[in-house]
Amino acid sequence: CLDWLTPFSLFTGVSVVVLYATLGCGWLIFKTEKALQNKMFEFMPKLIITLFVIFGCVSIYTPLVHHQIAERWFSQPQIFYFSPVPVLVLLFTFLALKACKQRKEFLPFIYTLALVILAYTGFLISLWPYVIPPSVTIWEAAAPASSQLFALIGALILIPIILIYTGLSYWVFRDKVRI
């Protein structure tokens, strides 16, 4: 009944909280000033280092437990294709810490977004093409073509509306928040 409740699942749950806290802290650095911004500049390096340690723990633990992922990451020629992901994680972690030290207002958020994209990229290339490793591929799990067409039509209608609304809200709230 509680097979899903493992130390690793709890760890990844905490990881998601730290990830979103880091994104939120970067956003607050960008959108606030004075006392709150100073507090976030103090807090952000701690979050970035914690996030980097979490990424490292997941990156070490996962290949040890899942041999298919270890084989995928560390065999040739894949190692040459996949190695930019951890290198870029290290680079963007360093850049985010440097941006905090130099008190750059927008860059910590951008670098954290890059870390999020790299985390999902690492996850995707580790599992591709399986959605339920190691047995069900993305094509076997896909919905029928008629359902996909219905979803596509809905997306074509709703995504522009969402983008317009989001753009408008960013335009309305484009200035810094003054407290």
Labelled PLM ranges:
Residues 138-140, 144, 156, 165-179:
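Extramembrane terminal tails and long inter-domain/linker segments of multi-pass membrane proteins
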Residues 54-64, 118-135:
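Hydrophobic alpha-helical transmembrane segments in multi-pass integral membrane proteins
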Residues 23, 127, 169:
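Divalent metal-coordination and catalytic microenvironments
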Residues 5, 9, 146-157:
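Individual transmembrane alpha-helices with interfacial aromatic-anchor signatures
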